[in-house]
Amino acid sequence: MDYFSMMVSLLLVAFHGAPETAASGTELSTGAENPGEKPPASAPWRPRRSKRCSCSSLMDKECVYFCHLDIIWVNTPGHIVPYGLGSPSRSKRSLKDLFPTRAAYHKNRCQCTSPHDKKCWNFCQAGTELRAQETMEKGRNNLKKGKDCSKLGKKCILQKLMQGRKIRRLEAISNSIKTSFHAAQLRAQLHREQKVTHNRTH
């Protein structure tokens, strides 16, 4: 009997001390009963953050600055922290289905939300070309800075030949990237034209 009276007194103190929680509990229960109701007008409406494109890596600061508009940037020691940078919206998942060639090509740096945004496509394409160009220039600089092989012998000459082959291979890769990008552009344009004519016929 002593245990029962102690429990009742604790419950009375708990409910008497927190009337706000009881009121909010009733509000929650009415909200659960009517899920179709809109929230009150006093609740602030948050607009959706606009993203021009979605970067594959947040470490690529140039891409993050370009793609994520309407973000407050705060400088911290070490790196820049973007506030309001969320996960990409679900609507972007269908981009691979709509434009398979461009999306497959641009997966290295970023993925544009709008297929008609030429600046975005050029930015993503220029990023891959610039990276290839940087690696080629780095290889050329290393080749120029190399040792004079006249006194060092066959091993040095072989190393220089291998570096020259690497540079030529990188140049061939960058040329193939450019040609594949132009081919992908033509395929995407053809796909869009076919889609438009298909929609007009039905």
Swiss-Prot record:
Protein name, entry field: Endothelin-1
Taxonomic placement: Eukaryota, Metazoa, Chordata, Craniata, Vertebrata
A Pfam family of this chain: Endothelin
Proregion span(s): 24-50, 74-202
Top-rank lineage group of the source organism: Eukaryota
Gene assigned in the entry: EDN1
Segments of this protein annotated with the region Endothelin-like: 110-124
Disulfide-linked positions: C53-C67, C55-C63
GO cellular component: cytoplasm; extracellular space
PANTHER family xref list: ENDOTHELIN, ENDOTHELIN-1
Region ranges (Disordered): 24-49
Alphabetical keyword list: Cleavage on pair of basic residues, Disulfide bond, Secreted, Signal, Vasoactive, Vasoconstrictor
SMART domains reported in the protein's UniProt record: END
GO BP annotation list: adenylate cyclase-inhibiting G protein-coupled receptor signaling pathway; artery smooth muscle contraction; axon extension; axonogenesis involved in innervation; body fluid secretion; branching involved in blood vessel morphogenesis; calcium ion transmembrane transport; calcium-mediated signaling
Site keyed Cleavage: positions: W73, V74
Family as reported in the entry's similarity comment: Belongs to the endothelin/sarafotoxin family.
Coiled coil regions, renumbered to chain: none
Protein role: Endothelins are endothelium-derived vasoconstrictor peptides. Probable ligand for G-protein coupled receptors EDNRA and EDNRB which activates PTK2B, BCAR1, BCAR3 and, GTPases RAP1 and RHOA cascade in glomerular mesangial cells. Also binds the DEAR/FBXW7-AS1 receptor. Promotes mesenteric arterial wall remodeling via activation of ROCK signaling and subsequent colocalization of NFATC3 with F-actin filaments. NFATC3 then translocates to the nucleus where it subsequently promotes the transcription of the smooth muscle hypertrophy and differentiation marker ACTA2.
Subcellular location as annotated: Secreted
Signal peptide: 1-23
GO molecular function annotations of the record: cytokine activity; endothelin A receptor binding; endothelin B receptor binding; hormone activity
Database matches in InterPro entries: Endothelin, Endothelin_toxin_CS, Endothln-like_toxin
